[in-house]
Every structure is written in C-alpha cells, then in structure tokens.
C-alpha cells in the first residue's frame, strides 16, 4: 500500500447531489450558512443585524403584528436615496378598511427605524382586495411605485351623454340679390319652413355708400325671426328650440331629434348650406361656431379614416376659433382609474400617498392616465386590457404586470403587450386618429398554439423577453427602436415555468424556475443567456447538479447582479437557497449552490448593493413576531464592532445581533443582566459578545463572548453573564443568537488525473489525516460520524392531546436531534420546535391517539426521538504566535484532523457556531492507497 497525499485547492464548487465519485474537487454534500467568495474561500455567512420588530404604530411603537397578519403579504423594496430605503408590504383584504400598505424605512432616524405614514386616496383601498401575495405586482419608477392587482378586471369610463340629430348649423356661403333662402326643420311629423327673400337692389347714392348693401346678416336675421316664430305661417315659438346667429351661420338646437334642410340662391340652391352631425370635408364647416361643437368628418372610402372635430372658440363661448380633432361624441373617455394599477407616491421622508393615476382629474375624473381625446372605437381603440366584442359589449381583462422599457410604460394582459406613448407614461391612446407616428402606443399579441398567458417580462439588449407558463417570446424591432410600425413578437423557447414567481436577471443572464409539483415535488432552476436579435437563446438547467435539492415550497426568487447570485425562499421555511457564479469574462470559474438557515421563516429577501434586507417570522400564534433584519455581504463592515490589534474589523457572525437595550448588575447573584430589545426567541441559542476596546481588570474585553443563561423579570427578557459587571461598558454589549456554519464533505477518492475528474473508486483507501487551511478565524470544529453507530433513542406514543415530549438523554448540539412520527422524519420549525435545559420536543399538532376511522382501527402515532451521533474531533492547530488578550482572529490557520478510517466508513463535517468569521480555503489529505493489484491502462 502506497502512502499518498492529494490536495483540494478550494471548496468553491458548492453543493452537488451527484454520487461522491462523480463530484468535482471542491464540491460538497451540503453547505449550510456558507458563502463562497473567490477571494476568501468558503466563508461563514454574515450575521443578520436586528433592525426592528414590525408594528403598526406610526412612526414607531404600536401593536406588533402576530399570528398570520403578514403571512400572505406582498413584500417590496424601494430605494429612493441614501436617506430613504424602504421595505414595505401590501396586505390585501376584501374588507376595505382592513386592506393596507405598510412601509418601514431601513435607514434609522436617531436609532429608530420608522414606519412611514400612508395617506390613502378616496376609495383606493378597494383596489387592494386580492388576498394572496402572488396576486400583486410592484414596479418602481423614479419617485413612484406602481402597484398592480392581478385579479382586478379593468373597466372603462363612459362618455358624456350625447344625442345625435339635436343640432344643426345653417351657413350662408353666398349673398345674392333677388334670391330666396329657405330652411326646413322637421320635428317629429311636422315640418317648419322658414324663408327669406332678398331685395332686388340697393338704394345707395354713390359707389362709396355701403350702408344699405345686402349682407349675410340681413339673410340670417330674417331667417332667425321666422324660425323663432315657428316658420312662415307664424304659428308661434317652437317649444325646446333655440336659434343663435354666430358669424355667417345660424345654430339651431332642440331637445328632441330633428332633421334639417336648406337651400338658397338663384342657381343650384347652394348659397345656403346645412350640416348636423357630419360633413364630407372639413372645408364645409363654419369658421365661427359655438365652443365645443362637435362634427364628424366622414371618409366615404374607409370608415377607419373618418375622424371627429371640435370647435375651440377663442373666447371659449362662441365666435372665431379653430376646429381641432376630438373624440367621438358620447364615446368612452378611457380606462377606469379605480380598476387600473395605482401608485404609491413618495411625498416626503417617511411619507407616501396611495392614489389612482389620473393625469387630468379636473376635466376627466375617474380616467386612468391620459384620457382618450380623439377618435372612436375603430380609429383609436382601448389597450388590450379591455376587449370590444362584435356586438359592441366590452369584456374586461386583468393586468398581470406593469413594466418600463424604452421610455414607455407597458402592461401584460393575457397574451397581449400594451405600451404607452413614448415619453408619456400613462397615455395609451394615439394623439391623432388621422395618422400614426412612431411615438404612438404599441399593442401586440403573442401568436402561439399553446396557452400563452404572459406573467413576466425582462428587458435585454435584443428586446423584451416575455414569459408565459409554457413558452417564452421576444418583443423587438429590427431597427432597435420599438414603434407601432416596427415592433414584432416572436417565439423563443418552450420551457415550463412557475407562473407565480417572476423571472430575474443577473447581469446579462436570466433565471426562472419551474416546479415538478406544487408541494411534494422539487424546484428546477433554468438559466437563459439571450443572443442577438432573431437568435435562439442558450437555456441551461443550472440546478441539474443539485437535482431535488430545492423544495417545491419556494414562493419567491430574487437576484443580486452586484454579487452574481440568485436566491430562492418560501414563507413556510427558514432556508434560503443560493446559486452563485464568478466569471473571468470568458467562462464561469465558479458555479456554486449553497443554502442559508435564517433565524425564522423567511418572508422577504432583497439585496441592495452589498446589503441584504430580510423579514423573518419567529414563533406562532399570539407570540409570533415579524422582524426586519439586515446583513452586510462584504468582509468590510459598515460599522465598527469587533476590532483586532492589527485593525481588522468584522461584524459578529450571530443573528439578531444588536446592542443590549440596557445592562444591570445583580450583586446578589454576581451576574450582569443584558436586556433584549426584542422578545427572547426560545428556539434559538443565545450568545453575547463584547465590542470595542474596553478593558476589564486590565484585560482586553473586545471579542469576549459567552453562551449566557436566559431569563426574564419585570424589566423584560435578558441574557445573564456570571461573575462580570458589564454596566460600565453597556454600550459595547451585543446580544444575539448563534447559527451554525456546517459543511458536509464527500468521501475522499484518489484522483488519477491532473484535473481531478477521474476517481479510483474501486481502490482501497485509508485516510489517515486531513489538514485544513482555515482563514479569517481560529475558531472551527470538526464532526465525524462512523458508519453503523447510533446515538441515544427514546420512543413515545401519541394520546391526541400531549404536544410536549421530554427525552431523558442530553445532547451537546440539538441540531443532532432527529424526530420521526410513524417512521417519517419531521421538519424542525414546521412540525416541531426544540429547546434545551431540559431537552424538550414540542409538536405543532398533538400526535394522534389510537382511533377508528371508517370502521378501521388505527394505532396511535409512534414518536421516535434519537441522536444522529456525531463525534467532535480534537484537531491540532499548528504552532503560531498571537497577541495575548487579542480577539481570536487569524488570517490563516492550519488544523490537522486525525481520521484513520477507510474512506467509505465515515462522514466528516466542518462546523462552527461561534460569533466569529471562518473560511474554509483548502484541504490536503494523507493516507494509504492500494489499487487492488489491478493493472490499469
């Protein structure tokens, strides 16, 4: 047997579910609370700082949210500037008064994380009637946040009441002597005829005298007199009729429908013309008219080329003015703002207004954005969120998502994409029904034989990538500028994806997920790399190496392009699953899967630059609490907490870390009570650390840490430190909870090629020892489990009422406890909770007693509690120099771990639950290797 040694240069390969002999060097079985960094190695994730317990008080205080208050909330993040970084949520409810938006500022004001004031517009809470988080979409556009209720059918705003055949304009086009001008007005079955005969000549004494010349006023005055007296026969005034002279015309109105005819002059009768609601040409209209008078200009060759015009008087009453294009009289004004997306507008620091989106609420109340100002249902249609059927009725659709691209705001509705005018974000109607411009709105549909309800969209250099449950599309323009004339939609790929979880982009890549089953299956993750215009994208199942690693309970996907990772989580679990890459510009040098276990069920995760914000829920029922936390993803902390003698600064690697709210000394029991600014979480293990450079009896206290006892008194919950009076340095006492850095290594095989891809799994290999290179700290442990060894075990029987079970054995690490019910492993946090001192298992639901169901006798639930026995190995650290009383941090250390077992006889974990950082950089193993006398070629 030959003595051999091999080195694993790094552990940046992440988790792999492949068999150990197929794993690449650097891949591991599991990496919990690890964070791969190309510079520092496989580091321990940063600790989460406690910011606030979420309450309903404004700006602070109030009642804590508990039970399931925020379980179905839609969470979002708003980054305005350095003073305004908000985390908010939408709590939908069918009862208007209970629907609400809550927003908290993550930038403290004098140490207080304030809740923003939300001012609601009239009836705006009615829009928040959807109950589930996936029923809402949120988009940030500058200083406003657009909120979309995906279940709200869009309606239209009806036009003002308008009756045709109620107006007529009689226009004198030529003044003739010795001529008859006649007007016939037919109301019901009665025709009223009014005539005026012009004089034969003038009585002027010379050519310069125009006093008695015949003009249009003479004709119009004569006709008007006749009309007002009921016609030539003078029967009396016609009820409901008015007649007004304006310029060279008479305008007649009546409260009932009527028809009108006119003729005048000696040849052809064209010296007097009449029009009511439409004309053939705009030249037929009077140059002076009543303000807002509307007439249709009819194109006899194409109805789509007809348009409407409205008179705009200079004095806004009547007289001289111009004819401008307008909307069909009585036509719908636009989309109802009450049923369209609303906006949350930032009005000041910690102040928002939730309102409808109306550009002209004075003239067009209730109309979303800009009203439809011109055209009709043929020449200027509504966007695709409302569909007009052949019988003229409207079918309401729902807006699934709002997006912003190329200076336009757009909507996704079923298989349609609607985009606003360029530069006019909420104007979805054309400026003119007569002509189309490149700035006009865009409305396109995806053509597919599959159901293609769009629910996601991402911009790329090649165009807009559209996502449906079964197919992906691209919306683009060959010349690069989207316009109604050039925009196209083409199919890209045919991958199934989860319609409730939006895709994300990570720099130049796009990621989306699909599920094999909504509960019992697992989650697949795909990566898409868009190519040039018209080219098929590259799509890769990036989660194949960890197949069935990510549960189907995932409810959200987020990304950090800055840090090149995506993160997935579900509200019923405390884990966040990550996929991180690192590229040198040509290829990905790192493709790494790992997960973080947070101190509560994860309801929200968002990364802003190098800061991660999270909302977690701890406890259940009335003791449940929602907490806002943050973590710094870099090795350089934002605040100075722990400092070594060399000036190295690190944040404590503990969750819920925060300064103790107060510190008091109990002289009777000789201990310090460090009070918590939050309720103690009994399911987590407490820890205290001292910050700064304070001294105690001449010894540097910075970096002092202890696992304290916990207690409560009239002041509140506290952690106690025995035999120390910490009141003099209360400002440096940080409280929090431990979390475990836990990396499970695969079996070691002798690798026969330089790249380490070929393993000799048939050989006999005995691993003598492993030498680990550990960075950033000197606090790390190693746990080993030998094959065939079991720990302490106890069994119990359910009685239908008892939830609490207390084994008689003890355990060093309660994470080693395994609980089974009827042979099935239970999930900690979901099915049960665990506490120490004494060891206690508390089920969420009491295990059932023996019972009879459908005449079948069923046995009582069998409970098995046992220790998954891991032995802590006593490693030896190579000799080194250190400064006495300094913080126990070292940039590089080597640990030698004795093994002396066959490679398939044990499992080894690298473990650390201390509040200090740690990084696994590399490992070399030594052992004896026998190729079983085979000659290999």
Predicted segments, located by residue:
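N-terminal beta-propeller domains
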Residues: 1-107, 290, 294-401, 405-454, ...
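Beta-sheet repeat architectures centered on beta-propellers
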Residues: 8-26, 30, 36-55, 79-81, ...
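Trp- and S/T/G-rich repeat-edge/linker motifs of beta-rich repeat architectures
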Residues: 43-68, 106-130, 157-162, 282, ...
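Structural signature of eukaryotic scaffold interfaces centered on beta-propeller domains
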Residues: 67-83, 130-141, 383-405, 446-461, ...
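Conserved beta-strand element within WD40/beta-propeller blades
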Residues: 87-92, 147, 410-411, 464-467, ...
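Loop/turn residues immediately N-terminal
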Residues: 94-101, 152-153, 408, 415-418, ...
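Long, charge-dense tracts
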Residues: 135-137, 144, 150, 157, ...
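Surface-exposed interaction regions enriched in Ser/Thr/Asp/Glu
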Residues: 260-268, 322-324, 330-337, 366-369, ...
